[in-house]
Structures are given as C-alpha cells and as structure tokens.
UniProtKB/Swiss-Prot annotation:
Organism of this sequence: Gallus gallus (Chicken)
Function: Transcription factor which plays a key role in the Hippo signaling pathway, a pathway involved in organ size control and tumor suppression by restricting proliferation and promoting apoptosis. The core of this pathway is composed of a kinase cascade wherein MST1/MST2, in complex with its regulatory protein SAV1, phosphorylates and activates LATS1/2 in complex with its regulatory protein MOB1, which in turn phosphorylates and inactivates YAP1 oncoprotein and WWTR1/TAZ. Binds m-cat elements from muscle-specific promoters and differentially activate transcription.
Record carries keyword DNA-binding: yes
Assigned GO CC terms: nucleus; transcription regulator complex
Name recorded for this polypeptide: Transcriptional enhancer factor TEF-3
Length: 438
C-alpha cells in the first residue's frame, strides 16, 4: 500500500531578504557584464554542483577552506572558462534572473483566467491575492528555486496549474550575499569518529559463546532492532530492452545475508555528528532518538553506482524495494524523507501488512516508484563531469527512513542514509553503523 510523494507544507529555504525590492526594479541588461553562453553554462553547472545552503558556508574537503555559495559559483566559472566573475556579479546575475522570472509569474497570475482557473469568485480572488503577496515577499533565490517557489505557492484554493513551472534544479535558497554568512557548518566528508565494536547493552556474552537463544544473531550486527530486521534494500533502474527482456541496474543495495554470533558487532557513530544533516523540527532525528528505543537507530553510508546509460526514458522505471522480518504480527508504516542541507524536500509514507512465512512475519515493499525529484537528481548527478563534483553535491544530500508500528507509533527502525559515488568497478557498496549518544 503506497502513498504519493509529498513536499513540506511550508518552505524551508533561505533567510536572505530583498525579494520585494528586487521586483520593483526595472529589468535591464546585466550591468555586471555580459554572460556569454560558456559562462552561462558554467553558471548553471555550478548551481547543480553546489546546492543551496541558506546562510551557511560550504567547506571544501580537499582544501579545508570556507566559501559562500556565490563565491564557489564564481570560482567554478573561473576554473571552467578562464573568465572572472566576482561573487557580487554572480549575485547580480541571480537577481536579474529572479526579476525576469517574477515578471513572468505575475503576468500569469494577473490574467482573469489562468490555465482554465477562474478567479471570478471572491474565494478565488483571495487565493490569487495571496499568491501575489507571496511572490512580493520572496527573495530572488526563492523565486528561481523550483522547490522553494512551489512550497511557498502551495496556497489553499490555488492549484499548481495556476502558476508556471520554474526551470532549474538545486536552485533553491541561494545566499544573496555570501560574505554576510554567519552560520558556519564545519561538516566535511571526513571519516566519522568511530567507537569500538563492543557488544550492545543487554546483549553481552562470554567470549566465544552465543547469547541466550532468545537473542537472534542479527541484533547488533545488521540493520535490526529487537522487533524488526531489514533483510534487503535497493534503489534501481529497470530498462525494457524488448517485449520480454528487462535490464536492471542497482544504484544502491543492501543484500540478504546470514549473520552468525561470531560476526563482529557494528561500529558505533555518535548521532550528534549528523544532527544538522537531517530535519531538526518536531519529528526530526534528534527527537526520535530521544524517544528511542536506542537499538533501532542506524547510519548507512552508500557508495552509489551511477555507471549506467539511460537509453529511453519512456521504457525506464526507477524504483525502490525493501524487505523486513519480525517475530511480531503488526502493521508497519515506512516514512522516507529526502533532505537537502538538513531540510526535508519530499516525503513518502507507505503502509505494509504482515505475511506469515516459516515461523516469522514478512513485510515487502516491492517496486515503489521513485519521485520526480529523485529522478531529476540522478540525471543531474550523471551529467556532472567529475566524481568529486558529484560527491560535493551528495555531501549535503541525505535520506531519513523511519519504520514505525502503525498502531502504537513505536519506532521499529530509523535509518539515516548518506552518500558518495562509487569509485569501484564492482558496483554499489555500503557500510552500516550503529547510532549512539554517549
């Protein structure tokens, strides 16, 4: 039983201001210099490489230096074209694009009938007025951001068709002036601080002897709590070759295995190291961990395999499949949140019922479709020319998966996913950690 992907009800974008002032200025040619096709192409590439970061600065892991996003865009243009654009010129160009886009949007909304949507009634006129006011309060960054714009414009009574699609991707919440940034997030792709692979509390046993028979071998050694075990997880692309032939490519994969008591316990990572990479508001990772149980929280580092050619989109299917096992008969709810810079972008909630098999209860989420955001994300990653550029993007992209008992709301599993691109020819790889707080 699957639900649709949904966006947050309210935008979680940049704090930078000046949107309404930008709308009042006439649209002139970019006074900061001509943006030739090669510069414009590099500018668009840089927007994809360096995702929006609000008031934060970005630390390049290979240099250890802090940059505002506009500084990084200017730096990228210089590296790609040999031509110089300052961060102020980048900021000016963003404002020019935003003013142009705002005029287009306002022109659409000012029509009496927009995409067959009648504003003649008082209720409809109120929705239109709210939309106009919303645009007037948006920053330049939000206007050219597809995600931020659609979130901001998700007003009651105003359908999506009433405003035009905003082109671009990863163009959300651009910092207006990188130099004024104060919220520095010093998170780089350095190895996590690990703790020894010691037995979990409650599972200690003499060396060489298994715990009591009531404690299964997978506890503490796999993605598993005392009530639910993830057997398998995969995100994949299926492409139809002919009527009866399909080619399946695994982007990420956790395969089935048979753990034994002789296997080492999972290494532990302090959950506070990753708090800022996931939502912090109500229902976020911190609150979930405080609620417990402690043995239900895991970090999975994926090295994704993007080495595939997408030949025909019309014959392609992007999906996720997962399997779980439990000693208990219950109804589970699986929430999957896609996050950028710690902010939720989209969420999917699925409900699954148990099937009794061989003395246990099995749960299968089979071929759940990926959302459009994720499909676009994969396409943009694949078009970046270098793996280090892909990893720079992925450094601020995370997924939070929470599996709960639908009836009791107890957390059964909470899995934080972080990503890099696989540098191996052997496909996708992964490593699993326990999340702890000492």
């Amino acid at each position: 039983m699957t639900s649709e992907w949904s966006s947050p009800a309210s935008p979680e974008g940049s704090n930078d201001s000046g949107g309404s002032e930008a709308l009042d200025k006439p649209i002139d040619n970019d006074a900061e210099g001509v943006w030739s096709p090669d510069i414009e192409q590099s500018f668009q590439e840089a927007l994809a490489i360096y995702p929006p970061c609000g008031r934060r600065k970005i630390i390049l892991s290979d240099e250890g230096k802090m940059y505002g996003r506009n500084e990084l865009i200017a730096r990228y243009i210089k590296l790609r074209t040999g031509k110089t654009r300052t961060r102020k010129q980048v900021s000016s160009h963003i404002q020019v694009l935003a003013r142009r886009k705002a005029r287009e949007i306002q022109a659409k909304l000012k029509k009496t009938q927009v995409d067959k949507y009648d504003f003649s009634s008082e209720k409809d006129q109120t929705a239109k007025d709210k939309a106009m006011q919303s645009i007037a309060t948006m920053s330049s960054a939000q206007i050219i951001s597809a995600t931020a714009f659609h979130s901001k414009m998700a007003l009651p009574g105003l359908p999506r068709s009433a405003y035009p699609a905003v082109s671009g991707f990863w163009q959300g919440a651009l910092p207006g002036q990188a130099g004024s940034s104060q919220d520095v997030k010093p998170f780089t792709q350095q190895p996590y601080a690990l703790q020894p692979s010691l037995p979990l509390p409650g599972f200690d046993s003499p060396t060489g002897l298994p715990p009591s028979s009531s404690t299964p071998a997978w506890q503490g050694r796999r993605v598993a709590s005392s009530k639910l075990w993830m057997l398998e997880f995969s995100a994949f692309l299926e492409q139809q070759q002919d009527q009866d032939t399909y080619n399946k490519h695994l982007f990420v994969h956790i395969g089935q295995s048979n753990p034994s008591y002789s296997d080492p316990y999972l290494e532990a990572v302090d959950i506070r190291q990753i708090y800022d990479k996931f939502p912090e508001k109500k229902g976020g990772l911190k609150e979930l961990f405080e609620r417990g149980p402690a043995n239900a929280f895991f970090l999975v580092k994926f090295w994704a395999d993007l080495n595939t050619n997408i030949e025909d989109e019309s014959r392609s299917f992007y999906g996720v499949s997962s399997q779980y096992e439990s000693p208990e008969n219950m109804v589970i709810t699986c929430s999957t949140k896609v996050c950028s810079f710690g902010k939720q972008v989209v969420e999917k909630v699925e409900t699954e019922y148990a099937h009794y098999e061989n003395g246990h209860y099995a749960y299968r989420i089979h071929r759940s479709p990926l959302c459009e955001y994720m499909i676009n994300f994969i396409h943009k990653l694949k078009h970046l020319p270098e793996k280090y550029m892909m990893n720079s993007v992925l450094e601020n992209f995370t997924i939070l998966q929470v599996v709960t008992n639908r009836d009791t709301q107890e957390t059964l599993l909470c899995i934080a996913y972080v990503f890099e691109v696989s540098a191996s020819d052997h496909g996708a790889q992964h490593h699993i950690y326990r999340l702890v707080k000492d």
